[in-house]
Amino acid sequence: MATQAAGIFSPAITTTTSAVKKLHLFSSSHRPKSLSFTKTAIRAEKTESSSAAPAVKEAPVGFTPPQLDPNTPSPIFAGSTGGLLRKAQVEEFYVITWNSPKEQIFEMPTGGAAIMREGPNLLKLARKEQCLALGTRLRSKYKITYQFYRVFPNGEVQYLHPKDGVYPEKANPGREGVGLNMRSIGKNVSPIEVKFTGKQSYDL
């Protein structure tokens, strides 16, 4: 499931619209006062501590995780996402991708509004929660499916969500529930009966 994608750290995205240059979406610099935007690429420093990526769980049988294309264009955004955190250079950052049926405006999870391109879009974010927030908005308002990945400093890519190809709020045959009890909360034993036993009422 983990693949090498060294080009993800410096995707060559050079697109112009209405004679105004786009700001590189992941620039760590502040927004300039003029309309001439600069673009910078974040290159992660390979360290010994980050060379050993955590163990990656295999995908369920019958599901093939989609491959990440680092050349996918980014949404049009004449602002800044605040840059990636320092941990992106020593630990990881996150990439969310989706396909849009048309060019339309959407709200960025970091604040502000951007224009998603018609077709594939790719957005780098510092935190997984930002990907989840944007993905929820894409599905609820725009009816667009999405995927997001974790990218390590050595270029290794780990597919994260949806893990088995089906979003967690939908039923998926064969998916095992975690901590599932087929009873209502009122049928749990009294908490006083399990006090000092090291167990919880939902464990019985």
Curated annotation (Swiss-Prot):
Residues 47-71 are annotated as: Disordered. It is found in: Plastid, Chloroplast thylakoid membrane. Residues 137-145 are annotated as: Ferredoxin and ferredoxin-oxidoreductase binding. The modification Phosphothreonine is found at T47. Keywords: Chloroplast, Membrane, Phosphoprotein, Photosynthesis, Photosystem I, Plastid, Thylakoid, Transit peptide. InterPro entries: PsaD (IPR003685), PsaD_sf (IPR036579). Residues 1-44 form a transit peptide. It holds the Pfam family PsaD. GO terms for biological process: photosynthesis. One of its GO terms (molecular function) is mRNA binding. It is a peripheral membrane protein. GO terms for cellular component: chloroplast envelope; chloroplast thylakoid; chloroplast thylakoid membrane; extracellular region; photosystem I reaction center; thylakoid. Interacts with CURT1C. Belongs to the PsaD family. PSAD can form complexes with ferredoxin and ferredoxin-oxidoreductase in photosystem I (PS I) reaction center. PSAD may encode the ferredoxin-docking protein. This is Photosystem I reaction center subunit II-2, chloroplastic. It comes from Arabidopsis thaliana (Mouse-ear cress).
